[in-house]
Regions:
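Active-site-proximal alpha-helix that buttresses catalytic centers in soluble enzyme cores
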Residues: 2-212
Length: 212
């Protein structure tokens, strides 16, 4: 372990650290599919045209795509798995970082609940010494990382400043981006190998069984 790493660890031990995980979000029920799509396509980072045209375009696209998307989600339980999966990631991060102090993860989705406003209010109630912003997008894009961080900073502005218990000077660190981070590519490759192996095993069994 490097001297810098030890110094950082000693400096953070005993602190309350809020880790905010950012992701796209997804509908949590069939009724949420259309408003989720509307939120997605009304984002200026996605469709960069002036209002009211962006609103109109988002309305048209979400209305047309909702029935098809709803049917697709129906094959996986009628909802997106992104929030439960992100909650599992949050729990794992808390376990790994528990020796640094009181570490708590919060989830901020971009286009459906829990939104950044909801996460910011929970972070404020936690009253951390430090905030770590962690977009779960390995590669940077204005439509993902940039949009999520901009949304967060707007939400956080409502929680700080005059008359608020939290200061704007609260230490905040953004982690971006990590497409070549140690272990990342290996982890993705392992998932692909596992998925491919499962698929081909099932395919082979089906073909062999059918051929018998």
């Amino acid at each position: 372990m490097s001297e810098n790493t030890l110094s950082e660890r000693n400096r953070t031990e005993g602190q309350r650290i809020a880790v905010v995980l950012f992701n796209l979000g997804g509908p949590d029920c069939p009724e949420a599919v259309k408003p989720f799509l509307f939120n997605l396509f009304s984002d200026k980072a996605i469709i960069n045209v002036p209002q009211p045209f962006r609103w109109l375009i988002a309305k048209i696209i979400s209305s047309r795509r909702a029935p098809v998307a709803r049917e697709i989600y129906g094959h996986i339980g009628g909802r997106s798995p992104i929030v439960p999966e992100t909650e599992r990631q949050a729990e794992a991060i808390e376990r790994v970082l528990s020796d640094l102090g009181e570490v708590k993860c919060f989830i901020a989705m971009r286009y459906w609940h829990p939104f950044a406003d909801e996460a910011a209010a929970k972070v404020a109630a936690f009253n951390p010494d430090k905030i770590v912003l962690l977009p779960l997008y390995p590669q940077y894009s204005t439509t993902t990382t940039a949009s999520s961080l901009k949304d967060w900073h707007q939400a956080w502005e409502k929680q700080v400043g005059p008359g608020r218990a939290l200061s704007k000077s609260l230490e905040t660190k953004e982690i971006c981006c990590y497409p070549e981070a140690p272990g990342w590519i290996e982890a993705q490759a392992a998932l692909i190998r596992h998925g491919a192996s499962s698929f081909f095993s099932a395919w082979t069994s089906e073909k062999c069984g059918g051929g018998g």
